[in-house]
């Protein structure tokens, strides 16, 4: 068995353990420590590899003491995401936490409140309230569900699942996105294998 270890704030991954001579190839997914900093470094590297001059290091804007003034700015690149149903399949089948965090921020941006977690939480609260789910039934600390401060009641979960199932626009894409134990990747890939 192998174990993967990375110190917080480090990009160095330590792999330890043993692998049998006849072991099959396998892949392990590892979360990045800071998705926005990782993206900034990856973007800088790709730009340089493509011959685009980049001065200075990649910087996570959230780590700056003084925030840059960004208005007005002209976008230099626009990327249109795949349909939500496709992204949801990746999020749920592979347990892609980066997607989950991004979904929460995107919800806030689409609602016109800004693309951040707080605006996403406000919009989620508004929708849940319209579905009859009061704020006392949950705490949404982050998009991925990894925070120990997230919680929800069984009533809330059942209400959401029933609502999705009864909505013909969302039922089939949602069911298609659900992970299947022992078949799909992510956190349940090795379950239900006998």
Ranges and model annotations:
Residues 2-168, 172-173:
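A small/polar active-site loop signature that marks catalytic segments
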Residues 131-134, 180-194:
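Active-site Gly/Thr loop motif
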């Amino acid at each position: 068995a192998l174990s993967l270890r990375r110190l917080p704030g480090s990009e160095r991954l330590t792999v330890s353990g043993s692998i049998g001579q006849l072991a099959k190839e396998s892949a392990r997914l590892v979360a990045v420590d800071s998705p926005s900093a990782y993206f900034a470094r990856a973007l800088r590297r790709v730009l340089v590899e493509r011959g685009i001059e980049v001065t200075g290091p990649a910087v996570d804007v959230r780590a700056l003491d003084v925030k840059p003034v960004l208005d007005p700015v002209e976008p230099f690149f626009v990327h249109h995401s795949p349909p939500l149903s496709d992204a949801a399949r990746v999020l749920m089948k592979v347990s892609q936490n980066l997607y989950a965090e991004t979904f929460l921020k995107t919800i806030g941006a689409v609602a016109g409140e800004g693309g951040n977690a707080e605006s996403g939480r406000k919009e989620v609260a508004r929708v849940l309230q319209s579905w009859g789910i009061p704020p006392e039934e949950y705490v949404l600390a982050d998009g991925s569900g990894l925070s120990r401060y997230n919680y929800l009641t069984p009533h809330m979960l059942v209400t959401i699942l029933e609502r999705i199932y009864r909505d013909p626009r969302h039922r089939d894409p949602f069911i298609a996105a659900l992970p299947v134990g022992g078949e799909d990747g992510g956190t349940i890939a090795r379950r239900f294998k006998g």
